[in-house]
Amino acid sequence: MRKLKMMLCVMMLPLVVVGCTSKQSVSQCVKPRLPPAWIMQPPPDFTWQTPLNGIISPSERG
């Protein structure tokens, strides 16, 4: 049993050493795309249209 543990330790040691000394690959930071132009425009002004309270009214209770 002791021989098996020693053999595992000897086999794992190079993997540990290589893993600790190798450089980690880091992906480049991707810049986000610009938003579409219609998002950047101010919202339209709908105050000139008929207000909804003139079109929709609560029904009478009866």
Curated annotation (Swiss-Prot):
Lipid attachment locations (S-diacylglycerol cysteine): C20
GO-annotated cellular components: host cell plasma membrane; membrane
Lipid-conjugated positions (N-palmitoyl cysteine): C20
Top-level taxon of the source organism: Viruses
Stretch list, region Proline-rich: 32-44
InterPro entries attached to this UniProt entry: O-spanin
One Pfam family named in its UniProt record: Rz1
Keywords: Cytolysis, Disulfide bond, Host cell lysis by virus, Host cell outer membrane, Host membrane, Lipoprotein, Membrane, Palmitate, Signal, Viral release from host cell
Topological domain spans for side Periplasmic: 20-62
Localization per record: Host cell outer membrane
UniProt keyword annotation of Membrane present: yes
GO biological-process terms attached to the record: viral release from host cell by cytolysis
Membrane topology: Lipid-anchor
Signal peptide residue numbers: 1-19
Quaternary data: Homodimer; disulfide-linked. Interacts (via C-terminus) with the spanin inner membrane subunit (via C-terminus). Part of the spanin complex which spans the entire periplasmic space. The spanin complex is composed of one homodimer of the i-spanin linked by intermolecular disulfide bonds involving two Cys residues and one homodimer of the o-spanin covalently linked by an intermolecular disulfide bond involving one Cys.
Annotated function: Component of the spanin complex that disrupts the host outer membrane and participates in cell lysis during virus exit. The spanin complex conducts the final step in host lysis by disrupting the outer membrane after holin and endolysin action have permeabilized the inner membrane and degraded the host peptidoglycans. Host outer membrane disruption is due to local fusion between the inner and outer membrane performed by the spanin complex.
Family the entry assigns: Belongs to the Lambdavirus o-spanin family.
Domain-level remarks: The proline-rich region is an essential fusion motif involved in host membrane fusion leading to lysis.
Name under which the protein is recorded: Spanin, outer lipoprotein subunit
Organism of derivation: Enterobacteria phage P21
